[in-house]
Amino acid sequence: IEDSKIIELIYDIQQIIEINQINTDFEGSQIFRKGIIKYNCTRHFKIFNEFKVIPYNCFSCYKIQIEPKNIIELIKLYLVFEKLNLERNLTRKCMVETRKNISGKYKGYIYCIGLKEAEHTLKLINPILDNTIGVKIPRFIKRGCSEFGIAHPDYKELDPSNKNFMKYNETWKEKEEIIDSELKEQVKGKKLIDEDKFYMKKNKIGITIRDALVIYNWLFYAQKIKDENVKKLSKKIPYSSFIDKKFL
């Protein structure tokens, strides 16, 4: 993917937003493309934040992490994910890193169930990344969410044969049940947790207004971290209060 294509894309986005007078003050830093599995991550993090235990389902969660080196590569990865056609429709997302205790800046993830699926998917994605973005873009397999590995370092171990490989602690099940019970009481028969706010309800082909507004936030983020590549994309980058607050 040539840099010129990304420059044209940003120009087109700006024209659409300006002509239609769309409010660019938007809260969002991630663009998802939903797969066949719904992970219920909001529920899992509620359990973790309350008790610092890792939910059972998260022990089979593996991700391919891709680390674009600049804002242009991040938008290229977004385009790759948009057209990515895998054997299974796996969830993927592009984002800018705003968590204070997590390293890195630009990231992409492909969600997998189990290490074997992650290894297989990485083999499939490697030539695609090489041909569309470049051979030097870092990519690797990680287990679950970074916060879990910080609280429980052995969780980061990928190899089940390693003595430090972490397995689910069965005593944590009661903690999960406590949160599930609380959530059921709160909603009283309604949908337990609505994760559709993270996704489009159906994956739409091509860029959406929501995508465009998140990309605007990415541009402001790039400016904040002094990524010089953002100057190639736009001379006027709208202010993002959502991103700015993340740096406080």
What are these language model-derived features?
Residues I1-L248:
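Structured alpha/beta or helical-core interaction and ligand-binding surfaces enriched in interleaved
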